């Protein structure tokens, strides 16, 4: 089971408060583990413009303003830009299932600051990581639902509504979602 490009949707029974009502886009998944970015938990006290200022990256008047999210509990000082696949930085952009790109170099920040770069993007500070077999065990334990990641939902500005919106997209009423696992 390769979850690359899939969304993990936290179940109501999620025991880890860091992932309560979270959506995590899995960017890489292999027998060695998995890496993903939480896409619906904005950082309240840091704007993209403020981050550019901290990094001494000048912002043009037409510079883009993308949302900054907490990508996960690992390496929170490290930044990742999740974006549409219409932007590629040679040797630096990782293509995720052909639907998304992930770039973690300063060139994408500079492009966005100039008003260029990908048509859709969000910034993530930190990432979510799993060791070998860990994410599969969590899915099996019913901590997460998995689904294909719709681009329009991933890049939506409605961060508070993304979790419920994804469940509804899957045909699930969040009020009737059971936290009890059943296995045949």
Curated annotation (Swiss-Prot):
InterPro entries: AlgH-like (IPR003774). GO terms for cellular component: cytosol. SUPFAM superfamilies: VC0467-like (SSF143456). Belongs to the UPF0301 (AlgH) family. NCBIfam families: PRK00228.1-4 (NF001268). PANTHER family: UNCHARACTERIZED PROTEIN YQGE, UPF0301 PROTEIN YQGE. This is UPF0301 protein RSKD131_2391. It comes from Cereibacter sphaeroides (strain KD131 / KCTC 12085) (Rhodobacter sphaeroides).
């Amino acid at each position: 089971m390769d979850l690359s490009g899939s969304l993990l949707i936290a179940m109501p029974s999620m025991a880890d408060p860091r992932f309560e009502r979270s959506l995590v886009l899995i960017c890489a998944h292999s027998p060695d583990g998995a890496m993903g970015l939480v896409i619906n938990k904005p950082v309240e006290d840091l704007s993209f413009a403020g981050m550019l200022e901290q990094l001494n990256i000048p912002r043009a008047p037409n510079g883009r303003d993308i949302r900054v999210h907490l990508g996960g509990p690992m390496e929170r000082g490290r930044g990742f830009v999740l974006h549409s696949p219409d932007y590629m930085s040679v040797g630096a952009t990782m293509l995720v299932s052909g639907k998304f790109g992930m770039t973690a170099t300063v060139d994408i920040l500079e492009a966005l600051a100039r008003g260029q770069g990908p048509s859709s993007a969000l910034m993530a500070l930190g990432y979510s990581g799993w060791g070998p077999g860990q994410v599969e065990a969590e899915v099996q334990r019913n901590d997460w639902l998995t689904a294909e990641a719709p681009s329009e939902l991933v890049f939506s500005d409605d961060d508070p509504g993304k979790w419920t919106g994804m469940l509804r997209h899957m045909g699930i009423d969040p009020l009737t979602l059971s936290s009890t696992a059943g296995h045949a």
